[in-house]
Amino acid sequence: MKYLILSLVANLLVFGVLSAIGLNINILAAMMIVLVIPIMISGIVFFKTNIDKTYIFFNIIFIDFYYYIYNVHLMTLPKFNNYIKTEMMELEHIDVLITSKDFGFDEILFFTLYLLLILIVLYYLKKQLKNKT
């Protein structure tokens, strides 16, 4: 249980730092941090815990919640619309569609499936490592 709490607090800190940085970061860097750092924290701590399925469930729920709050926070910032326009001009050669005030179910579903897939792979990897020892 302590590892579950450790993971949730560490991920909360990551999203807290990202919220504090706000719009002072490149949008691609923010996307990569959101996709990579929380799953790295969860994956590393996952190998320490004994409550695998509970750990996976609560991590997905809380990371989705943190992600949602982070995005809502960014969209309510006064400079958000100008930030999106500027970033889209810089990303003209990369096919990324980012619109203002358009955060919804499909993003949460993608993020949930992404986390679930990686944590299931880690679950089976952990299971195989236990069987070898």
From Swiss-Prot:
UniProt keyword annotation of Glycosyltransferase present: no
Coiled-coil ranges per UniProt: none
Gene Ontology CC entries for this record: plasma membrane
Membrane topology, as annotated: Multi-pass membrane protein
Subcellular localization(s) per the UniProt record: Cell membrane
Keywords, ordered alphabetically: Cell membrane, Membrane, Transmembrane, Transmembrane helix
Residue ranges crossing the lipid bilayer per the database entry: 3-23, 27-47, 55-75, 103-123
NCBIfam families for the chain: membran_MsaC
Known function: Accessory element involved in the expression of sarA and several virulence factors. Modulates SarA production and/or function in a strain-dependent manner. Affects the transcription of the accessory gene regulator (agr) and genes encoding virulence factors including alpha toxin (hla) and protein A (spa).
The protein, known as: Protein msa
Lineage: Bacteria, Bacillati, Bacillota, Bacilli, Bacillales
Name of the gene: msa
